[in-house]
């Protein structure tokens, strides 16, 4: 029942421990920090990739199919491999943000590319007739035209980064985060279902706030 879920927030998460809401705040902040870093990495990478594709049809034909194919592989299958690679590279602290970035870069790439390449033909021909450089066309025509698409992509990617961070926490071995909290409470679901649902609702709230 909803009342049981709400009551569980003020009950101790563990015996003689702090209230559940306090534990979830700590876990939520850890997840949010990973999501923010992943959002930044994925956003910058996706934006740069879209600019490259917008200026090179060869790169678009050669790489875009692989970008699309990368999103057909379940993130749950890729996350453990990323954790292993980052651990071997001595950057295990960045494993979760990288997993979050993996889900973030794709919407940014696709939406930004669509905005950059959907400029009015007459406007593009006019700038070319004035011998405008590629850089001038990019900053004065393509980017302003793509802004609505970019903002849409960022809103989608914001929630995707939270999902990626939560999933990335599961195989990473970290001690704090919403993913770990959900996993730990799920082990005792039969004993205390409200705690699991309270944690899931808190994770959803983080995604809504980041959106």
Question: Residue locations for each model-derived region?
Answer:
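Short cytoplasmic-facing helical segments at TM-TM junctions of multi-pass membrane proteins
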Residues: 111-150
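Hydrophobic alpha-helical transmembrane segments of polytopic membrane proteins
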Residues: 178-211
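Periplasmic/extracellular loop-to-transmembrane helix junction in inner-membrane transport proteins
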Residues: 1-40, 193
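Alpha-helical membrane-interface segments at transmembrane helix boundaries
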Residues: 25-36, 60, 67-70, 147, ...
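Transmembrane-helix boundary motif in ABC transporter permease subunits
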Residues: 37-67
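Generic hydrophobic transmembrane alpha-helix motif, especially the helices
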Residues: 68-107, 114-115
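Transmembrane alpha-helices
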Residues: 98-102, 135-168, 198, 202
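Short hydrophobic, aromatic-rich alpha-helical segments embedded in or entering the lipid bilayer
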Residues: 1-11, 172-187
């Amino acid at each position: 029942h909803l009342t049981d879920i709400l009551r569980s927030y003020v009950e101790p998460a563990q015996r003689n421990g702090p209230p559940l809401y306090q534990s979830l705040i700590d876990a939520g902040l850890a997840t949010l920090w990973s999501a923010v870093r992943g959002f930044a990495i994925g956003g910058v990478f996706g934006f740069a990739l879209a600019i490259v594709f917008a200026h090179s049809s060869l790169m678009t034909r050669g790489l875009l199919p692989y970008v699309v194919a990368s999103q057909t592989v379940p993130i749950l299958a890729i996350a453990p491999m990323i954790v292993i690679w980052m651990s071997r590279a001595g950057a295990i602290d960045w494993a979760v943000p990288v997993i979050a970035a993996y889900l973030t870069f794709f919407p940014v790439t696709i939406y930004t590319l669509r905005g950059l390449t959907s400029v009015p033909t007459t406007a593009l021909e006019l700038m070319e007739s004035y011998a405008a450089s590629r850089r001038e066309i990019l900053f004065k025509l393509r980017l302003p035209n793509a802004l609505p698409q970019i903002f849409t992509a960022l809103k989608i990617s914001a929630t995707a980064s939270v999902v990626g961070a939560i999933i990335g926490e599961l195989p990473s071995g970290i001690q704090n985060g919403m993913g770990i909290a959900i996993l730990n409470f799920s082990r005792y679901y039969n004993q205390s279902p409200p705690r699991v649902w309270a944690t899931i609702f808190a994770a959803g709230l983080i995604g809504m706030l980041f959106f």
